[in-house]
Amino acid sequence: MAAPRWAVWAVLLLRLLVPAARVLANMEGDALHSLRTNLVDPNNVLQSWDPTLVNPCTWFHVTCNNDNSVIRVDLGNAALSGTLVPQLGQLKNLQYLELYSNNISGTIPSELGNLTNLVSLDLYLNNFTGPIPDSLGNLLKLRFLRLNNNSLSGSIPKSLTAITALQVLDLSNNNLSGEVPSTGSFSLFTPISFANNPSLCGPGTTKPCPGAPPFSPPPPYNPPTPVQSPGSSSSTGAIAGGVAAGAALLFAIPAIGFAWYRRRKPQEHFFDVPAEEDPEVHLGQLKRFSLRELQVATDTFSNKNILGRGGFGKVYKGRLADGSLVAVKRLKEERTPGGELQFQTEVEMISMAVHRNLLRLRGFCMTPTERLLVYPYMANGSVASRLRERPPSEPPLDWRTRRRIALGSARGLSYLHDHCDPKIIHRDVKAANILLDEDFEAVVGDFGLAKLMDYKDTHVTTAVRGTIGHIAPEYLSTGKSSEKTDVFGYGIMLLELITGQRAFDLARLANDDDVMLLDWVKGLLKEKRLEMLVDPDLQSNYIDVEVESLIQVALLCTQGSPTERPKMAEVVRMLEGDGLAERWEEWQKIEVVRQEVELGPHRNSEWIVDSTDNLHAVELSGPR
């Protein structure tokens, strides 16, 4: 019996498609092999890229779709050097090209503009030179473009403004010149995206272009006037103070008992669970570690390797098979149905938050009983450990480093709030969560471990996450967090940097001082005892005006009403010297008017009116 006509056509179509697929695979394989021959690979990362294998989908660091077409190339942080090749433009279905943190040099091929399905182009932390290709403006699906920390020159192509899908742009730390485009998608980006390009000018930077009119000053800050009954602010302050003090005692007493109990508690035992990996789980460029690999790295999660403990679990120091040091965070969470999917989602979101001042997630591990995150090891520890737990043989953090930490951590938090989609609220900003890399640059850690923010401005959680002394009053009383929750915690962290003190310290009771650092600082300001504020470890080696500015920023960040606190992007600008004086003066006027409306003296009126601007240098550098 003759075969049905449709079957004949199906066979013919299959015969046509199979050779076409082979041709595509050959073309993509040839393109990737050309890249390999142009790169120096000291660690044999590209060893599996065998040109005799027709299909590149079997190669490591290459991901294909169901049609055996290359959609992802992941070669980040692989110690590669050499140059890119124009043949990369033949990978027509490529969505992710990850070549960050290598030593690749030369120019960026204009043929990359042919990759019209590209979603992410990450070439940062390399040695690229020459211009940014104008052809990149053809990548209309591009969401992430990070070319920072190279040596790129020339102007920024205006064609990039047509990429309406662009969400993350980082061109900082290059040698770019000319005017920064301000139309299209570029209207969304702040000067952080273009920082440290001395020859750039225009609205996207802090300096006008030659011949252009000077920038208009920003409008004065006019916070919304809350509608409330007379005296409600005072009563609210009293209630907030009572809640904070009560919470302090509530946490302190059980903490003492728990510490005593832990001394008696037998050592916990770790049960070895076979590493079960789901081959279907792919989370971008993140490496999925086996549980056994991390057990070996941490000596079976030995107590001697514990770097710290926190609300999310313990952190262990580990050494991988390649000799690199890592910090392994072993999460403690209750296993619930659907928890695996939630974990994958949160890990993916964390991995997409890439910034100089954010701790980069290196990989993860997921088994039926374990959730682990792997980060680079920070040899210089945290700001908290450097302020209060450093060995006598090590010098204290100098004032210049503290200033750099303040600015770097502010930039990292601003990135989480303004450049992540959905935005990420940290919810536990404190000195212990600001880590220090080998150059003592601030690196914000532990972000994204709490529930991620959605597109709304606030998020109500079932449990308050945070540390006493750092928790904003509205978060403590309502469980309602927002960006301004992080701003409050950041302000407390600034006071830690200035004073060297803990945010919550029962030891201060011995001197009849406040246990809360914020209250202690306000008390000293009220009594005009500013000489007691600055960390004695600095030994007068600081700049008075900068100390005054940092105190002002800290107090603006820790205002009782979240609506009156600045956003982190504004904090960055104030730390860079833009707008602090105006904001401080405006805030003082508002406080004076508020006192008059309430027909009663504000409990902090003396230190509000006597701003640190009116203090003489001798008052900050006197005897301690």
Swiss-Prot record:
Which residues are sugar-modified? Answer: 103, 114, 127, 149, 175
Give the UniProt subcellular location, in the record's own words: Cell membrane
Reply yes or no: does the keyword Cell inner membrane apply: no
- Alphabetized InterPro entries for the sequence: Kinase-like_dom_sf, Leu-rich_rpt, LRR_dom_sf, LRR_N_plant-typ, Prot_kinase_dom, Protein_kinase_ATP_BS, Ser-Thr/Tyr_kinase_cat_dom, Ser/Thr_kinase_AS
Q: Name one Pfam family in it.
A: PK_Tyr_Ser-Thr
Q: Note the segments forming the LRR repeats.
A: 91-115, 117-139, 140-163, 164-188
Keyword ATP-binding (UniProt) = yes
Which intervals hold domain Protein kinase? 301-588
Transmembrane ranges? 238-258
* Annotated segments matching region Disordered: 205-236
Report which reactions are catalysed by this protein. L-seryl-[protein] + ATP = O-phospho-L-seryl-[protein] + ADP + H(+); L-threonyl-[protein] + ATP = O-phospho-L-threonyl-[protein] + ADP + H(+)
Enzyme's top EC category: transferase
As recorded in UniProt, its EC number(s) are 2.7.11.1
Taken from the record's topology, the Extracellular segments are 26-237
Entry-linked SMART domains: S_TKc
In terms of SUPFAM superfamilies, this protein maps to: L domain-like (SSF52058), Protein kinase-like (PK-like) (SSF56112)
Q: Give binding positions for ATP.
A: 307-315, 329
Where in the sequence is the signal peptide annotated? Answer: 1-25
Topological domains on the Cytoplasmic side lie at 259-624
Membrane topology term: Single-pass membrane protein
Could you state a single Gene Ontology molecular function term?
protein homodimerization activity
What are the record's GO terms for cellular component? plasma membrane
**Which keywords does this chain's UniProt record carry?**
ATP-binding, Cell membrane, Glycoprotein, Kinase, Leucine-rich repeat, Membrane, Nucleotide-binding, Receptor, Repeat, Serine/threonine-protein kinase, Signal, Transferase, Transmembrane, Transmembrane helix
Q: Which family does it belong to?
A: Belongs to the protein kinase superfamily. Ser/Thr protein kinase family.
Q: What does this protein do?
A: LRR receptor kinase involved in defense response. Does not seem to be required specifically for XA21-mediated immunity or basal resistance to Xanthomonas oryzae pv. oryzae (Xoo), or immunity to Magnaporthe oryzae. Involved in brassinosteroid (BR) signaling pathway. Acts as a coreceptor of BRI1. Forms at the plasma membrane a receptor complex with BRI1 which is activated in response to brassinolide. Phosphorylates BRI1. Required for normal plant growth and leaf development. Possesses kinase activity in vitro.
> What protein name does the entry list?
LRR receptor kinase BAK1
The organism named in the record is Oryza sativa subsp. indica
- Which gene carries the instructions for this protein? BAK1
